[in-house]
């Protein structure tokens, strides 16, 4: 099952935008993702929804952060996260794609900085693969703003992800040996910038139950879409769920 990297970004922003100190919420939801890989149908996957904001650390979905410095306007933290992007040839309908090597999800470690203003929050982060699957790293720059309309909160976000050459080539490149097995042309992917937009809605029911839905859209650059593994130039993600706020 392939889960797009943008789901991670989509998850993290709404929790960061609405969390308060020492707030814990746990829930479950479903994520729908249009995979850019050829031979995949749309994916729907059950997911946990986890958020915790403490004085020294936080959990924002797949990211654990250890706060190094925090003030009214700035937060700097070390991060450990799980990168869910993967490719499983046995889960693909295309014969040529079935001949390719598996690309594994991986663990990442890095740093994240948040800057808060009245008009919104800016996030800048970078994280490297620590399991030596891709030997690459990923960066992110985004801005988001929470708007309150009665009990409903809306959080639009705009951002860009950066994949270095090693990361891009691991997930989207095709080696010479893979090319001979599959008949697909060999391809060496370059570093890539992936812009995205998202909108998150949260609505509390009573004191503890919170309904959440998020939609995200990303435009894939030619460094990715030129790969014979890819058959679309955009990706859409939708997440919905319910959580219990303690």
From Swiss-Prot:
GO biological-process terms attached to the record: peptidoglycan biosynthetic process
Keyword Signal recorded: yes
Domain of life of the organism encoding this protein: Bacteria
Endpoints of the signal sequence: 1-21
Sorted UniProt keywords: Cell outer membrane, Membrane, Signal
One Pfam family linked to the record: MipA
Locations listed in the record: Cell outer membrane
GO CC annotation: cell outer membrane
Predominant localisation class: membrane
Membrane topology of the entry: Peripheral membrane protein
Residue spans crossing the bilayer: none
Family stated for the protein in its record: Belongs to the MipA/OmpV family.
Protein name from the UniProt record: Putative outer membrane protein YiaT
Native species: Escherichia coli (strain K12)
Gene label: yiaT
């Amino acid at each position: 099952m392939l889960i797009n990297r943008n789901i991670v970004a989509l998850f993290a922003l709404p929790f960061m935008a609405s969390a308060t100190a020492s707030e814990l919420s746990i829930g479950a939801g479903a994520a729908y993702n249009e995979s850019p890989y050829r031979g995949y149908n749309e994916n729907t996957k059950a997911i946990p929804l986890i958020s915790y904001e403490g004085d020294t650390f936080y959990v924002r979905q797949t990211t654990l952060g250890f706060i190094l410095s925090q003030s009214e306007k700035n937060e700097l933290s070390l991060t450990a996260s799980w990168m869910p992007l993967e490719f499983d040839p046995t889960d693909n309908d295309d014969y040529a794609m079935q001949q390719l090597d598996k690309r594994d999800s991986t663990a990442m470690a890095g740093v994240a900085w948040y800057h808060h203003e009245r008009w919104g929050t800016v996030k800048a982060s970078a994280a490297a693969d620590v399991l030596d699957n891709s030997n690459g790293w990923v960066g992110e720059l985004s801005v988001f703003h929470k708007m309150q309309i009665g009990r409903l909160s809306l959080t639009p976000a705009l951002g860009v992800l950066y994949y270095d050459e090693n990361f891009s080539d691991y997930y989207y490149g095709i080696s010479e040996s893979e090319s001979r097995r599959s008949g697909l042309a060999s391809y060496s992917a370059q570093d890539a910038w992936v812009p995205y937009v998202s909108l998150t809605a949260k609505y509390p029911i009573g004191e503890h139950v919170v309904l959440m839905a998020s939609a995200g859209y990303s435009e894939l650059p030619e460094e990715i879409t030129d790969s014979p593994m890819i058959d679309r130039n955009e990706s859409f993600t939708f997440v919905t769920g319910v959580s219990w706020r303690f």
